[in-house]
UniProtKB/Swiss-Prot annotation:
HAMAP family in the cross-refs: ApaH
Gene Ontology biological process terms in this record: RNA decapping
Classification lineage: Bacteria, Pseudomonadati, Pseudomonadota, Gammaproteobacteria, Lysobacterales
Biased composition (Gly residues): 298-309
Disulfide bonds: none
Protein name listed in UniProt: Bis(5'-nucleosyl)-tetraphosphatase, symmetrical
GO CC terms, sorted: cytoplasm
Catalysed reaction, written as an equation: P(1),P(4)-bis(5'-adenosyl) tetraphosphate + H2O = 2 ADP + 2 H(+)
Family assignment from sequence similarity: Belongs to the Ap4A hydrolase family.
Organism from which the protein derives: Xanthomonas campestris pv. campestris (strain ATCC 33913 / DSM 3586 / NCPPB 528 / LMG 568 / P 25)
GO terms assigned for molecular function: bis(5'-nucleosyl)-tetraphosphatase (symmetrical) activity; phosphatase activity
Composition bias type Basic residues, residue spans: 282-297
Amino acid composition bias (Low complexity), ranges on this chain: 310-324
Gene3D superfamilies associated with the record: 3.60.21.10
Length: 324
């Protein structure tokens, strides 16, 4: 039996099938861990979601920011749904939309297998969160998503504020937890998320750190596998294994085997992307580079503007939605 973690699919159905063939996935004995962002931008989001749903007995899924945005869109009126991008619109108007969205809503923000020694999240963790604390906070939001009041949560999850504090309550608390699990890249030593910095380490504003390199962070008792940050490429450092390699942006789709002592990485090329012509930019003053140790593989292509494959959200959500 093999256990494979797979990076952000983002609606790249054909490429997902190619990766499953390459790792020789056998549903009779293998298990897949999907790191979130199953949908959006790849053009085959409905097919991708149906595929992962069909594998639900043989897989584990954590929710990404794009998945939460899809759930929020699904909870709106049909008139509003017809204004979103075609890739997501096909899902919310499909005949089996209720089956797919009800199943997606039951998925996790964090998955832990202590026997295997791994935790899976989509984006990041607060610097002071142990894995036990992360599980507890994930369950708080999961219970709301899976309960009868989930529509109110989906309407109130948008926005950058407040930053995490143990004393938060209500939707402020839920929003802060969601932002950490699904939107985090850089933060301050106090755990304040910087949502505007999305590029590779060394390009961020002074005083910000990759969430897994923040000074004073707690030591964690599990290895972590995550996605979300395609600008990193394949990055293995500080017990964190970041495997979003930008398949939707022309990078690669990555699988990491979790049940072996020796790391095994399998990749397939991402979708073909034609880069738009861009006007020359004025040189930018280099920012202070934060020192780091990491193992890199093929870098996810990003979207050409240094934000690691996180272009402006589709016209579906108010404010700075979790679609980034």
């Amino acid at each position: 039996m093999s256990v494979w973690a797979i990076g952000d699919l983002q609606g790249c159905y054909d490429i997902t099938q190619q990766l499953l063939e390459k790792i020789r996935f056998d549903p009779a004995q293998d298990t897949l861990w999907f790191c979130g962002d199953l949908v959006n931008r790849g053009g085959q989001s409905l097919e991708t979601l149906r595929l992962v749903h069909s594998l639900r007995a043989h897989s584990v899924v954590v929710l990404g920011n794009h998945d939460l945005s899809l759930l929020a869109i699904g909870a709106r009126s049909e008139e509003e749904q017809r204004k979103v991008n075609p890739d997501l619109q096909r899902i919310v108007l499909a005949e089996d939309r209720d089956v797919l969205l009800d199943w997606l809503r039951m998925q996790k923000l964090a998955h832990v297998d202590r026997e295997l020694g791994w935790m899976m999240i989509h984006a990041g963790l607060a610097p002071k969160w142990t894995t036990q604390m992360a599980e507890k906070h994930a369950r708080e939001v999961e219970q709301q998503l899976q309960g009868g009041g989930y529509r109110k949560l989906l309407r109130n999850m948008y926005g950058d504020q407040p930053g995490w504090s143990p004393g938060l309550s209500g939707y402020d608390r839920s929003r802060a937890i969601i932002n950490l699990f699904t939107r985090m890249r850089y933060c301050t030593p106090r755990g304040r998320i910087a949502t505007d910095d999305k590029g590779t380490p060394g390009t961020q504003a002074q005083g910000l750190y990759p969430w897994f390199e923040v000074p004073g962070r707690v030591e964690r008792d599990l290895k972590i596998v995550c996605g979300h940050w395609s600008a990193l490429g394949l990055t293995i450092t500080q017990g964190v294994h970041a495997i979003d390699t930008g398949a939707v942006w022309g990078g690669k789709l990555t699988a990491l085997q979790l049940d072996t002592d020796e790391l095994r990485v399998v990749q397939v090329p991402g979708r073909e992307v034609t880069a738009p012509a861009t006007a020359p930019r004025a040189p930018r003053r280099p920012r202070e580079r934060q020192g780091r140790q990491r193992a890199r593989g093929g870098r996810g292509g990003g979207n050409g503007n240094g934000n690691g494959g996180n272009a402006a959200a589709p016209a579906a959500a108010p404010g700075d939605a979790p679609q980034e």
